[in-house]
Amino acid sequence: MARLGKILLFLLGVVFLLDLQVRFPERSDLKHPPRLHADEAVQWSLAKDAAGGVPYSINEDKFHGPALAVATRGVFAARGLAFDDATVADLRQIPFYFFVLLCAVPLCLTGVAWPMRLLAALLLWRVAAGCYFGEYFIQETLLVAGFVWGVLLWLRSADEGRPAWWAGFAGMAFGLALACKVTSAAYLGLFALALVWCARDTLTWRRTAWAAAGALGVGVALQTSLFTDGQGLVAWGHQFVRSFAVASGNADTLPLTNPGYWVAVGVWLALLVVARLLRRGPRSSADAPLVTAVGCFLFHLALPYKTPWLLFLPVCLSLTMVWPLLAEGAWWSRAAGFAGATAFSLVSVANLEEHTATEAHIENLPEVVSAYRADWQAAHPERLFYVAIDGGHYWPLPYYLRAFQVGYGDFPAAARAPVRFLVRTDASAPQVPGYRTYSLLLREGERYWVLLDDSVPLKKSACSPLN
């Protein structure tokens, strides 16, 4: 029977690898160049401003810390790459590095056979934890990678009888998560409760002190942009206080719009709990990841603020650590665990409602504006060419217009700009003397009127986003 189990696992691995080879090109940027999502454009802008000497804390980011900006500045400095020259692929490389670290977590599990570790890592890599945003230029991938590694390092340092100071490495990983988003403080509280219930013996004063020191060291360093922005700690405090208003539904509440994904995650976690109960045995530190994942899910389920990105942590905890540990044992247990994790990942992909994508033709906007600028400056060599954007949720326009001087809002020279972007609220095009009006679809449900100085004709092409 054991031999049959090995053969079955081998066949599962072969099927998986073949699928990987067939489908991997579908994720290639060469076939479908990626478009920057609005939230990614916000993070790009904040990181660019920070690189230009603007303290991150003055941006009043309501949700996130500067961890992504610090990491991006470091990588771009090492590569000699300027923010204005960065492509979407360049930006997404930053969270990709952390996603690779996340995929490596199953390989570091103890008490799990190597074939199962490898299958778990490959499954996570292949389906991106059932989430399309694992490679996005956002904070969530850094947060989840830091937190999951913190859980792993804490458990390994305790289970292997290492000195107390090894817990400091877990704290450092948690510090990364804390500098990404204040919600990490709640996650840490849930993990502490899980340890109290499952593995209280690991919570010694010395280990806790070392973990706290590591978290404070890395968290403060990142939150202050490597100790150059002392107000970053104050900003984190403001975000923490504000988080209670968000949690209570009194500020920035997002209602549930994708129940299918939440149901899929809830059923998956419930099945893992049932599997753990069927295994019986006393509670141990190996149960802490499952308890933490369930706690995080229930935490967000109880609060009015709902977005699928909030489930990235419990999903990754379950796929990196929980199911491989529960599946270890007989061949049928391993096969059932792998099949269940694969099925959940595929169901997640099918049920997860994707964001409102930026229209593909926006990639051609810089080329169109650049050609118009050349003609306009030839006709008006003594005047300054600039773009004015007034109103609306205009992201990701700043990224695609980064080669031009752009002003936002109602500034004195906005009405005289050679190129003006106005929010389109109805089908009646504005008639402004001295301008020709075009329509621009930024993304579904979001259109702009683009006004161009009529002293210079626009050379339109078939791929122009202006209609």
What annotation goes with each model-predicted range?
Residues 142-159, 170-174, 293, 317-321:
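Specific aromatic-rich, kink-prone transmembrane helix
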